[in-house]
Amino acid sequence: MQFLALTRRRTENFSEAEFTSRVPAEVGRARALYAEGFIRQVWHRADIAGACLLIEADSEERVREKLGTLPFAEAGMLEFTIVPLKPYAGFCP
């Protein structure tokens, strides 16, 4: 099953320096999740500080569990919106 995960950096509670110091670990963990097929695609958001991820997982619980292993998430620096996706019916016969 696929999910869209929208993240928002909690910039009202954390400084840019606090985010910057964790970037190498965040990137490393995101690469590991990508390598195992959990993260399918990832983009930076253009509207606010955060990211948009296309995720492959069995359940929303699993999505939250694995995203919770990101260093920003472990530090409480992110908010997540998780949207379950289903196939577009317009492309079905």
Outline where the language-model segments fall.
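Conserved, structured core segments of small domains
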Residues: 1-93
